[in-house]
Amino acid sequence: MDFDKKKLISYIKRLNEPKILVVGDLAIDEMMYGDTERISREAPVLILQHTRTDIILGAASNAAHNVSTLNGGKVLVAGVCGDDYQTGLLTGAFDKANIDYKYLVKDNTRKTTTKTRISGSISTSITQQIVRIDRQTKEELSKETEALLIENLKKAIPEVDAVILSDYHIGTLTKKVIEKTIEIANKYKKIVVVDAQKNLETYKNITSMTPNLPDTQKSVGFFINNDVDLKKAGDKLLRDTKAKSILITCGADGMFVTEQNKKYTKIPVFNKSEVFDVTGAGDTVTAVYTLALAAGADSVYAALIGNIAASLVVKQFGCATTTISELLCAVENIL
């Protein structure tokens, strides 16, 4: 479809205005790199000579990082972490990314979610991930921790223009936390956007959600093979969630926006040839889409901006972010 380029640019320029709260499963990605030396005598495994370790914000933390890069740090996070060494890595990464974590709840019975990826390389090859180690507590929050988080939400939500619920199903977003977040946000007339992988019908009376195609199929209970199926799926999610719009991300096939009153828009993908790593691209879409909605864009223009942002971050390895200047440059090159 045709887009008004001037309108699109005006929305992008306003992405630095809204203040956002990200509620969900906060995590860090620990990226360990080494050069391959030889096969160990102890076991049939590689011996790596360690070269560096990078700490990157992941899961809901990555969504917050994407917001911070675009709006100059007008972002809060609310979630739960442990009281361990990894907690310091998480808060240190928040400090570096200019993310406010004053509403973070510490629970010494839980682990701070950390995903350690160990990668090796030799001089004649690209870096190859060898193993991933997950350190997390997947049980639901205790009643005490849940109550503390909800109290923090009561303080945080009035401060912001929009709320992102980022559910990686690691235990933070209990049924009560979800319901209270939406209830408080609706009371203060705040935008609520959901990024979840399953149980999509749990999120009712929201502004929008951004499921990918496989998660949409699981939720609606049928395979999506064409645009007719996409329309049926979008309509079902609208009914189930009572949302104002649904944005389904379709990978190489772009995006599909369903709005109330049977309004549908298909948005093509803008970058098929330079895809190096899709890790965290969904977080980028959700973050940019939410910022654009809060900046006054409708669902279609917000999705278009999110799509452009995704086309930029997939050119980079690992969880990546983009900037307003990069988005504006991309608009000139794409449209």
Provide a role label for each language-model segment.
Residues 159-172:
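Short acidic, glycine-rich surface-loop motifs adjacent to enzyme active sites
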Residues 26, 168, 284:
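Active-site metal-binding loops of divalent metal-dependent hydrolases
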Residues 15, 157-158, 203-204:
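A short, aliphatic-rich alpha-helical micro-motif
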Residues 1-37:
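Positively charged, low-complexity intrinsically disordered leader regions
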Residues 170-264:
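Conserved phosphate/ATP/ADP-binding segment of small-molecule kinases
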Residues 21-23, 132, 161-164, 193, ...:
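Structural motif
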Residues 244, 270-332:
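Conserved post-catalytic alpha-helical subdomain immediately downstream of the catalytic base
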Residues 20, 28-162, 323-335:
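Conserved N-terminal subdomain of the carbohydrate kinase-like
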